[in-house]
Amino acid sequence: MAKVFIFDSAKCNGCRNCQLACKDEHVDNEWLPYAMPQPDTGQFWTSIEEKVRGQVPKVKLSYIAKRCQHCDNAPCMKVAPEAVYKREDGLVIIDPEKAKGKKELVDACPYNAIFWNYELEIPQKCTGCAHLVDAGELPHCVDVCPHQALRFGDEEEFAEEIAQAEAFLPERAELDKPRTYYLNMPKRFVAGIVIDPEQDEVLIGAKMTLQNVETEEVYTTQT
């Protein structure tokens, strides 16, 4: 059964438990045939990026998980098909033995999710904790998320969420066919106070329409 990752930005509070769990699972641990140990520094197979919008005093902070997308049509597989493969469950794996010396795989990933291990001279990335999945367990990053912002499971199980989801890089979604789906990604942030000058009071529930003078894009929001 094909697996997918679901990340909901609205549920993420930036605790970075997933980021630490990945380090805990992979630093100094060898999980062959899927992965050699991850270095202490220089690599984050799962990381949380901050997205800051607005300006003081109206600021909105959101978080986005940056990770391997486990694409069905993975660019890295095209560059080194003998060293990168997709499992039946959809997880994309870089074979640590066959990929030795193939630094070109780092640049092949448009999501910047592949890292170079200078000591071992191999490219490395998220394996989806394939060794845990094989044992019927969840990837460590998913297991430690306290708010279920990051989930993992059968594609059919998340059909409703997938229908509403976005891609990390929308412009590459059709080409790469990523198996990591994003919900509630940060959008345009409009902030301010609307006042009725006649009543001299703040309006609540007023519908606002704004237009970008450069792009002519129109946005609507409610106070």
Please describe what each predicted stretch is.
Residues I204, E214-T223:
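Short, acidic Ser/Thr/Gly-rich low-complexity loop/linker segments typical of extracellular
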Residues E30-R67, D72, K78, I93-I193:
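Flanking helices and flexible, charged tails adjoining ferredoxin-like Fe-S electron-transfer domains
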Residues F189, G205-K207:
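Exposed beta-strand and adjacent loop surfaces of beta-rich binding modules
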Residues L210-N212:
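Conserved aromatic beta-strand anchor motif in extracellular beta-sandwich/beta-rich domains
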Residues I193-L203:
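Structural motif
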Residues C15-A21, E25-H26, E30:
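Hydrophobic alpha-helical membrane-insertion signals
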Residues K86-I93:
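Mid-length scaffold segments of soluble, non-membrane domains
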